[in-house]
C-alpha cells in the first residue's frame, strides 16, 4: 500500500519529474499491488492444502516442503511487465485494448428515461465503434426488492392520480428526507445492487434516473472504486428537477438547460462537475436529413395541406379524443366546403383510443397511429405539434422546428417545461381543446407568419448535438481517469477479489 500511496503522490505533484518517470512508477506500483493480492490468495490456498494433506497422511512434512517450494517459488508475475529500450516504454498488459463496459442505469417510470438511455447507447457505437460495450439496465428492478423493483407500476398508478404524485414529489424533496429514505433502502439492498454491478463489470456508469445515483455510488465507495469507475448523471428533466438528481460524488452532471445547472450548483456540485449540453435525443433525430415533401409522400399524407401532430404519449393519455374532434371541426372551412389542414394522431399503446377515433366520421384527412418508433418522420412531415409537457417530446419537436402547443403536464417534474417552451417563444400553453383547435386553424390561415416565427425560435432553442457532446465528454473523462485505469485489464477486479489490506465494509 505504501507503493500505491507513493504513486498517488507522484501523480499529484509531477513537478521535477518527467511524464515517462511518473507513468513507470505508477505502473510499477499498481503491478506490485496486484502481485501482493495474488500471493495473498495463494497463501490462503497453500494453508488449505497443508491442512488437507496433514489430515490425509498424518505426517506430511516432506510433502509440505515440496508444496511450499511449488507455491512460493519463482512466479511468472515476478517477470517485468514493461521493458525500456532506447528511451521508449513498452507496456505489456493483457487486455490493454479491451472494450470498456458502459452500464446505463434507468427505470421505466415514464418513457423518457428509457428513451434517453437508448439515445446515449447509439453514439458510443457511431463515434467509437467497438471501443465500448453498452448495457441499458433497470438495476433496481433486476437486483433489488420492494419498493425499488416496483417503481414502474407505482409511478403509473400515481400519475393517474396526479395529486398523489404531487404530494410524493414535494414531500421527498428535502435532502434529509430522501437521504434517510435511500439510506434505509441501501441497508437492505446494497449487496444485491453490488451483485448487479459485478455482473456487468462497468468501467463507466451513466445514470438517467434520479434514484439511480445514491445506492450505486455508495457501493462504489464501500468497495474503494469511486476513483476507478467513471460515474455520470444525465438529467432528463428540462427545467424542474427533483433534488435526488444531484449527487456531489459524480464525475459529471450533464444538465439540459442553464436553469438545471443553477440548481445543480445550489446542491453542492462544483463547476468542474457541471456541463450544459441539452437533452440526449436519438441520432435519427439529430443527424437525419429529412425533406418534408418526401416524408409526406412516404407517409401517404396530403402534400398540399399543412399538418398538425396530436400526441398522447406512449400510453395515449390526456384529452386526445376531445382535441382531435375539435380539430376536425376547426380545420374544415364550411364556406369553401373543404379542409384547410390535416391531422395525425399518435395513440401509443391505447388501442381503445385508436379504435374509437377510427370509428368516427371525419371531414378532414386524418391518420390514426398506434405506438410509433419513427417519430422523427412524423414530426418531420408536420407543421406543429400538440402534446403534454414531456421533456423528450419537447426536445424532439424543437429539433424539427415544430411550434408546440402544450395541453397538459405532470405535477412536479414537468411543471417547469411549460415556461421553458413559452418564455422562449417556441410555443403556447392551452388546456382547452376548443381554444387549441382554433389556434391551429389560425396558424394554418391568417396567422401563418406567427407559425413561421415560432418555428424559427424552436430551431434556435434546439440542441441536436447534445447526445454526441455528452458521449464525447464521457469518453474524455474515461481517458483522463488515470494511468491505472488506462492500462489495467482488470479495472473492476475489486468487485470480486478481497484485498489483504482491507476488510469489507457493511452498512448497518
UniProtKB/Swiss-Prot annotation:
GO cellular component: chloroplast membrane
Reactions catalysed, as given in the entry: a 1,2-diacyl-sn-glycerol + UDP-alpha-D-galactose = a 1,2-diacyl-3-O-(beta-D-galactosyl)-sn-glycerol + UDP + H(+)
Cystine crosslinks: none
GO BP annotations, alphabetical order: glycolipid biosynthetic process
Transit peptide limits: 1-60
Superkingdom: Eukaryota
EC numbers on record: 2.4.1.46
Segments of this protein annotated with the region Disordered: 51-79
Record field: transmembrane: none
Broadest EC class assigned to this enzyme: transferase
Subcellular location: Plastid, Chloroplast membrane
UniProt KW Plastid keyword: yes
Gene3D superfamilies in UniProt: Glycogen Phosphorylase B
Record's keyword annotation contains Glycosyltransferase: yes
GO molecular function, one term: 1,2-diacylglycerol 3-beta-galactosyltransferase activity
Keywords: Chloroplast, Glycosyltransferase, Membrane, Plastid, Transferase, Transit peptide
UniProt xrefs under Pfam families: Glyco_tran_28_C, MGDG_synth
InterPro entries: Diacylglyc_glucosyltr_N, Glyco_trans_28_C, Glycosyltransf_28_UgtP
Family per similarity comment: Belongs to the glycosyltransferase 28 family.
Function: Involved in the synthesis of the major structural component of photosynthetic membranes.
The protein, known as: Probable monogalactosyldiacylglycerol synthase 3, chloroplastic
Organism, scientific name: Oryza sativa subsp. japonica
